[in-house]
Amino acid sequence: MAEFQSALELNRFQQHDFLYPLIFQEYIYALAHDHGLNRSILLKNAGYDKKFSLLIVKRLITRMYDQNYLIHSTNDCKQKPFWGRNNHFDSQMISEAFSVIMEIPFSLRLLSWLEKFEKTGTGRVKSDNLRSINLRSIHSIFSFLEDKISHLYYVLDILIPYPIHLEILVQALRYWLKDASSLHFVRFFLHEFHNWNSLITSKKVGPSFSEINQRFFFFLYNSHVCEYESIFVFLRNQSSYLRSTSYRALVERIYFYGKIEHLGEVLSRAFQANLSIFTDSFMHYVRYQGKLILASKGTSLVMNKWNYYFVNFWQSYFYLWSQPRRIHINQLSNHSLDFLAYFSSVRRRTSTVRNQMLSKLFLSDNAINKFDTFVPIIPMIGSLAKSKFCNRAGHPISKAVWLDLSDSDIIDRFGRIARNLSHYHSGSSNKKSLSRIKYILQLSCARTLARXHKSTVRAFLKIFGSELLEEFFTSEEQVLSLTFPRASSISRRLYSERVWYLDISCINELANHD
């Protein structure tokens, strides 16, 4: 029992992290502001850069220094709310600054973990360590799936359930961060947030966050997911020798001894005689945000056991309500995965090989499983239509909200969006859908420029030339031709193949159609 207890222990921050005073420091708001400018490719908060100034930050800090201000705003929140209802800009500044503050202990933990990847005495970095650092890109998930999933049979496609109340998010954070003032501030912020019910009742993948407080609530949600996700890591590491008599060690760690008996009563009948079914060395777990995939080489019975385990574990020990329609068990041979803005599938391909043995010739058919990824064209067009680049049928339209910008700014924004989409979907097995998306953006840019000049697209391009747009829509093939200037055939072949990049940390905003 002591062995399992030590395995479940996490390196939480046992010391007191006095982070709350940082909310009154001006440089924290400057850091949050710089992060916000580099985050959005659509530049939805274009006015945020114009409104931000250190003078506004100083006035906000002065108001927060008033000891009675927070008390008055709490007692009279319906008449004079501190933020979130009447002053969205203050809410944006405070939430983004506070999210930067809350991430400091976790960033320090990451830095301490990366210390092992420093240069050795010979001045070289170990290759295994370097590969581990590159795995921070979400494109590394597809290279992993490409290598592993083609040999598996079943997949458990799960939308992670949401917590019943946001206070559960704060309690999960309490065991990682020992700072009572900061946690009280989190509770106050959630109380003032006027639309907090939508965060836990959305039907989308994971909580539905407002644009203003997105980073802050994603931080809370991810800290909660990591809390129970570490249990699954423990289960996977111990699966080779886990027996039914030791299953009670899988109790939720916050109340390690208090819930042992209750766990045994609830799940003993389901798992006591069949725990050997979890000793599956081909079980693979992948998660991004609110969606996870569990793939196995076992039978459908194995996947149903895992399904039953997840539902009971979430509901009994993390107070998460899981609905059956959020969990799907599918066979990989006839099902496509909708994951990370790609449609992924495993298809069986046959090839005929001519063999010769002595004087005899014969043909043999070899069947292999190939992992394919495609751009979901219909959801992508829906995202473009929602952002007013085209209509629902995919016909490009002008971007009306950008008409007041200069021509160079309009072209720069459209070109940046097209390049980012091309960069993110470089792993697609078929580039025709991606070419259609780029065509929609290019024609939408032309119509926006023509409308700003009160002209037609044909007349505008006749005056300025089509080269005006081509300059800002550099394709991946042209980029590769610069890398391989003497081998254009190599660059064309590389462009037609799937390419996974190691510098992508999040889903493209337009590609995130969930």
UniProtKB/Swiss-Prot annotation:
Main localisation: plastid
Record carries keyword DNA damage: no
GO biological process: mRNA processing; RNA splicing; tRNA processing
Matching InterPro entries: Domain_X, Maturase_MatK, Maturase_MatK_N
Pfam family, one: Intron_maturas2
Presence of the UniProt keyword Plastid in the record: yes
Keywords: Chloroplast, mRNA processing, Plastid, RNA-binding, tRNA processing
Name of this chain's protein: Maturase K
The protein's role, per its UniProt record: Usually encoded in the trnK tRNA gene intron. Probably assists in splicing its own and other chloroplast group II introns.
Native species: Trachelium caeruleum
Cellular localization per UniProt: Plastid, Chloroplast
Record's signal peptide: none
Family: Belongs to the intron maturase 2 family. MatK subfamily.
Single GO cellular component term: chloroplast
UniProt GO molecular function: RNA binding
